[in-house]
């Protein structure tokens, strides 16, 4: 789990115009909430935040919000639908040692058995882990799995200290037979002539 330090500054202006001015200045408007505190509005440096959010479930250490640093998890990220720029972020305050529920990407390793194709039902699994020990991904070894095999959430090998937070019977991936190739027009015409 990676921790990234980001300097935050309190936001005093609100509304669409203020948010646009902040974005033009290279800042991203954000709201900080959780642990019984009143929601606080802050601005974060856009470039630093963009780089930090490239890591799944990154833990941010905000400086400049309180006397002490705040540990937060990005809960909701809004992006421009065309350009992909960050528009707004909701941040959840967490404590060291506190368990949180997050979605962790599944990392497929290996090749399925001959004639099979891996059908990925879910790209992420919901797990409960300490805020400072969230895994970056869960490896799933599919090497040599035969056709008809289902991998359920309960089959996932979770790191120490991480618990499953979803139904263990949920199918996350399965091995199916390859689809037969469609016949070309020439082959169909040849069969029809016979």
UniProtKB/Swiss-Prot annotation:
GO terms for cellular component: cytosolic large ribosomal subunit. The keyword RNA-binding applies. It comes from the Bacteria. InterPro entries: Rbsml_bL25/Gln-tRNA_synth_N, Ribosomal_bL25/Gln-tRNA_synth, Ribosomal_bL25_b-dom, Ribosomal_bL25_C, Ribosomal_bL25_long, Ribosomal_L25_dom, Ribosomal_uL5_bac-type. Keywords: Ribonucleoprotein, Ribosomal protein, RNA-binding, rRNA-binding. GO terms for biological process: translation. Disulfide bonds: none annotated. CDD domains: Ribosomal_L25_TL5_CTC. One of its GO terms (molecular function) is structural constituent of ribosome. Pfam families: Ribosomal_L25p, Ribosomal_TL5_C. Belongs to the bacterial ribosomal protein bL25 family. CTC subfamily. HAMAP family: Ribosomal_bL25_CTC. Part of the 50S ribosomal subunit; part of the 5S rRNA/L5/L18/L25 subcomplex. Contacts the 5S rRNA. Binds to the 5S rRNA independently of L5 and L18. This is one of the proteins that binds to the 5S RNA in the ribosome where it forms part of the central protuberance. This is Large ribosomal subunit protein bL25. It comes from Thermobifida fusca (strain YX). The gene is rplY.
């Amino acid at each position: 789990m990676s921790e990234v330090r980001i300097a935050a500054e309190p936001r005093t202006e609100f509304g669409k115009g203020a948010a646009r001015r902040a974005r033009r200045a290279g800042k991203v408007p954000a709201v900080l909430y959780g642990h019984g505190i009143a929601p606080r509005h802050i601005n974060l440096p856009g470039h630093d935040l963009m780089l930090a959010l490239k890591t799944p479930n990154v833990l941010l250490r905000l400086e400049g919000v309180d006397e002490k640093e705040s540990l937060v998890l990005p809960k909701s990220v809004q992006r421009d639908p065309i350009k992909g720029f960050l528009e707004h972020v909701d941040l959840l305050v967490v404590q060291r040692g506190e368990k949180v529920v997050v979605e962790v990407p599944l990392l497929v390793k290996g090749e399925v058995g001959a004639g099979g194709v891996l059908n990925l039902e879910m790209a992420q699994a919901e797990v409960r882990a300490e805020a400072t020990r969230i895994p970056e991904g869960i490896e799933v070894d599919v090497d040599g799995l035969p056709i008809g095999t289902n991998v359920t959430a309960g089959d996932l090998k979770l790191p120490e200290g991480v618990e499953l937070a979803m139904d263990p019977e949920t199918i996350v991936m399965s091995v199916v037979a390859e689809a037969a190739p469609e016949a070309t027009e020439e082959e169909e015409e040849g069969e029809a002539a016979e």
